Amino acid sequence: MKMNMDQWTKELLEAPVKKALPVLSFPSIQLMGITVKELINDSDLQAKGMKAVADRTPNSGGAVSLMDLSVEAECFGAPIRVADDEVPTVVGPVLDTEIDEDERMEVAEALEVPEIGAGRTQIYIDAIEKAMDLITDRPVFAGVIGPFSLAGRLMDVTSSLIYCYDEPDMAHVVLEKSTEFIIKYIKAYKAIGANGVVIAEPLAGLLSPSLAVEFSGDYCKRIAEEVKDENFAVIYHNCGNTANVTLDSILSANANAYHFGNAVDMEEIMSKVPSDVICMGNIDPAGQFRNGTPESVREATLSVMEKCCKYPNFVISSGCDIPPMSSWDNIDAFFNAVDEFYAK
């Protein structure tokens, strides 16, 4: 359903009671009795899964698609590993780490930007188009990887951090191609009517403040400028532990909202951002949703809300993607705790 997302952002900021907006999609496999492997290869199952999650969580502020950070890298030729009960992962780079610097630059320059429809991208685009027909009571967000997180997977995650210092020109070549692809991919989601996109840039959380601007922030800003408008929102996600010291880089993206992980103190983040900038977070997805209990989830949720809801721009959420096999008792406990807090 078409929505004015500038108005949505304004109303969310002004609402005294804010709906939680966790990154919740993969646990749909439990509601449907399927595997992750089946989910990531079938647009109908993805759309039905998003609808099942929406029906189970009437008080959620949005429907978020799969945070599958293997999709884009796979299009560039990166090998991935798929399991029945875990999120897919990239298991090897596209650029050989064993060749010399000049050769690596040649490989980077020869890297082709995939067409939209390569790999599983069309499945994911079709899934959002189908979900838009099924979910009409809240915004529907697509999910894509961020520029440095994609480039890092193509270059090898550990090596990419070294390349920022030792081979910055090569890193920028890969970043340019990653950014070009991400923009095309988001525009494909926009064309089929998605209300917005969550851009997941976790790898930027490993960069120092000076590098974060050059190798992530500037590219995220360019992506947002290309795709964001009054009918299409951008939510920027960074679950790194340096988000508190790279806030200038993060906020330069000019997104509608920013989503933070549990590696940072959410109250510290809130104290540092302008009061008109929506920030979301940050209940531990693994420690609480996956491995906690309903009581521990309740306590963690109330604790974060008690510290952060005094800031009018705070929205309670998970710290990152909620793992596929997280207990629905824990997920229900999270939403119940949000209701409990606002009922006080």
Language-model regions: role of each:
Residues 46-68, 188-195, 252-255:
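Catalytic domains of carbohydrate-active enzymes, especially glycoside hydrolases
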Residues 65-75, 141-150:
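Short, glycine/charge-rich beta-strand/loop segments that flank catalytic centers
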Residues 27, 31-32, 59-69, 74:
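Active-site loop/lid in soluble adenylation, ligation, and acyl-transfer enzymes
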Residues 44-47, 125:
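Short amphipathic alpha-helical segment that frequently serves as the phosphate-/nucleotide-binding helix
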Residues 1-28, 36-37, 114-344:
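Active-site loop segments of alpha/beta catalytic cores
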Residues 70-86:
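Glycine-rich loop at the start of a catalytic domain that most often binds anionic cofactors/ligands
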Residues 86-130:
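A gly/proline- and charged-residue-enriched helix-loop-helix capping module
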Residues 34-45:
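Surface-exposed strand-loop-strand hairpins of Gram-negative outer-membrane beta-barrel proteins
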